[in-house]
Amino acid sequence: GRGGPSNYVRL
C-alpha cells in the first residue's frame, strides 16, 4: 500500500 507499514497491512 502507500504511506507506511500500517497502510501496507491494509493494502
Curated annotation (Swiss-Prot):
Keywords: Amidation, Neuropeptide, Secreted. One of its GO terms (biological process) is neuropeptide signaling pathway. It is found in: Secreted. The keyword Signal does not apply. Disulfide bonds: none annotated. Its main location: secreted. The modification Leucine amide is found at residue 11. GO terms for cellular component: extracellular region. The keyword Secreted applies. Belongs to the FARP (FMRF amide related peptide) family. FMRFamides and FMRFamide-like peptides are neuropeptides. This is Extended FMRFamide-9. It comes from Praedatophasma maraisi. The lineage of its organism: Eukaryota, Metazoa, Ecdysozoa, Arthropoda, Hexapoda.
